Amino acid sequence: MEYDVVVVGGGAAGLSAGMMLGRSRRRVAVIDAGAPRNAPATHLHGFLSRDGASPAELLAAGRAEVMGYGGEVITGRVRGIEHDGECRFVVRLDGGPELTTRGVLVATGLRDELPDLPGLRARWGNDVLHCPYCHGFEVRDAPIGVLGGDNRPFTLHQAALVRQWSADVVFFPNRIVLTDEERERLTARGIRIVDGAVTRLDVREDRLHGVELADGRTVPRAAVFVGPRFVPHDELLTGLGCQVGENGWVSTDATGRTSVPGVWAAGNVVDSPAQLITAAGAGSAAAVALNHHLLAEDVERAVTNYRAAGVVV
């Protein structure tokens, strides 16, 4: 089962790349483990022409478009990728076939590590949120909380940003110790600061009612934003020896090219802020760059064969 490109990850980045490569008449397979990051969300936003659709609808449409251009979508999980020492990669699936390919695009995304608080994970993607651009408009003018977590810079920025959508924002530093300057900036922004350890979210009748603190207080809130710790699913890339930057993430150029020839990456696996529409664009750009990489190989092979046939150039 030999391909021009195997795309690992069937989200917005991977499917966009698969479609573009199919349109380029490349033999492409998209391998999807079926565990999208945004699965808990009922709607997606900020994606032109798809605003308000469910994530499942977007993925179904993307798969249909990939297959419509001759691409394959394979359900499975990749356990490893190996370079065969020439210009080929071997992609091994759990309990499935081995795929041989000339190029690889990894679009496996990331996972959100949330604070360990009762009620928080169960409401993730509903009324516990992290991206104001994705969900802020839907909770506009509501009582909003911002919960301090391990991702300190992200959380402080998030608190100031969320204020654009509501005049009633409470920041719960929780384990974050604020400096005097940080307190001043948040207060000047019109954000109320409630100190004390957060113990749980008050969830009743399938709805968030508030944030409960260790001293027994419950602050009523209709939605809570939290800053997760973003952990990329980059094991396949690091296993291939792709260079990692000072920030701990795999390094790529503007097209998604890694330090390993023939290996590209796109979407949240190398870009934590990437939204759906950004990831889709990155997948498309990576596909074009990968096609040009294959084109260079095709031309070199054609010249070698031409000369071997005894034609004097």
Model-inferred region functions:
Residues M1-V5, V73-A142, V224-G227, V250-A254, ...:
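FAD-binding core/adjacent interface of flavoenzyme oxidoreductases
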Residues G11-A12, L110-D112, N151-P153, V270:
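Residue-level detector of alpha-helix initiation sites
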Residues G18-M19, L156-A160, A266-V313:
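A conserved FAD-binding loop/helix module that cradles the flavin
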Residues A60, V66-L93, E98-T101, Q164-S251, ...:
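A Rossmann-like FAD-binding core segment of flavoenzymes
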Residues A122-E138, P228-Q275, H292:
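FAD-site-proximal beta/loop scaffold in flavoenzymes
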Residues N126-Y133, V146-A159, T179-D180:
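Active-site glycine-rich loop that binds ribose-phosphate moieties when present
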